[in-house]
Amino acid sequence: MTILSAITSISRPNKISKSVISSNGGASLSMGSNSVSCFNACGGGSSYSYSSSYSGSGLDYSYKANYSSSTGYNSSVVIASSTCHCS
């Protein structure tokens, strides 16, 4: 995680690749490590928008969430790659 955070903090917006990780029967996605990486890449404590997409077997999935240090975030659908936009 330290290495990933260091790499993703080099430029903004940040591209973070991650294997598909689903929870709750695939209805939602565990965004823990990506969220931490995005949080660190944005300098910590900042708000950011987090968007992701995944294509496989002819199906396209999209994911978008807004995060703030005070309200947290919600997640849905399975994704494979994502981009952080610091604000």
Swiss-Prot record:
Q: Which PANTHER family match?
A: HSSA/B-LIKE PROTEIN 1-RELATED-RELATED, HSSA_B-LIKE PROTEIN 1-RELATED
Identify one Pfam family in the record. Coiled
Q: Cross-referenced InterPro entries, in alphabetical order? A: HssA/B-like_chaperone, HssA/B-related
Report the protein name in the record.
Answer: HssA/B-like protein 56
Q: Which GO terms describe its biological process?
A: sorocarp development
User: What does the sequence similarity comment in the record state about its family?
Assistant: Belongs to the hssA/B family.
Q: Which domain of life is it from?
A: Eukaryota
